[in-house]
């Protein structure tokens, strides 16, 4: 999600919903080159972060906040890793690159389209076949009042493994501002490369995102879009809508055709060894999940392609979620939060394919089904859940808890250890008492049998934050934002590599308050 910082003030841009290509399905089009207009704002190296123990603070540059970390490990070299985050002390996303297994990290700013733009929603992939790292981001123009306009989806290549970053390529164009006659507000993009050497599409990189279309501020739709590249990110296919339609699963409609699954968010990509690509996303149109009219509980859905993204299956149901309008407390910004907190949360997680077994996938998410929900005064006991399919998404197991504790857990991220086949799930955890602090934990094993390791060596305190303050009685210094996701990736050596948003470091400006940085740990 999009955030922008002016001094220590926060502007949260409103998401408004992209026009589909039209017709009954995506039109097959030739590859085209989409180059960002105007001058490029160059990447900039800032500092080197060194490991000082079990946890490493990757933000060695300044005291301004960072959040939403993602991490990727080079399949051909497990000591080579790249992480990235939102950075509020500069124009751009932050990159963190290590070639020595996390002992040290080169840190700096990503490239963007031009100096008037700001980066957001950072995600990085490594394309082993073409020897290039690819960083996807949203690049917005910000008005003086903090409104985000003309948000493009861009991809920046790095030919040296993440030490320098080239001019970004626009793969999806945004259009307009919130109240314009037509606005296309791109949000929550994701990027992944098929690094399976036996795949027919080895070296193909996929990017997906949500395209929110609105007319004069009125929401119309928000389908999932997709594009792909076969040459290390130099050329990209025309974007196509892939979220599809289902009269059984997508019964509610704001403005679209009956059965169109076009009110979506939070797409994530994974590929199986045989080259099948899967995209999972949340959708809010399944009225059979609503406990009351227009409650908009989400469902997780999945689509797949067996021919490298040229054609896509109809969406299939994965799991229903307890995350509707009356299922969580609401924070000062009108977003869902956790009891006693103000940080916005959601149920989004990710899908990951088994690296050895075609059609075997795991998907993780969180919701409040075990708390007080469907109430005017909801109380959270948010849990992380995992579901599994063995047949490429046709059938899924029932959700099972990853952590058996009774406190809030949220922001899950999963990966599969290629050495032993175990699933790892990283998440934030308040512990059984649901107190003011949280830690970050890693559960490893198999559904129904996980072993938990607390990765963070100190707790984080989002109720006493230097930045993103709620400013309300009883919670004046509570943060309203700490990103929307965290990151986990296993290397071919079997090590787990975790990055998360951490709030342990005291502020140099205000005694008793804490900063927001990206931390790394290896297990």
What are these regions (language model features)?
Residues 2-13:
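Bacterial N-terminal signal peptides
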Residues 19-523:
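C-terminal PAP-associated
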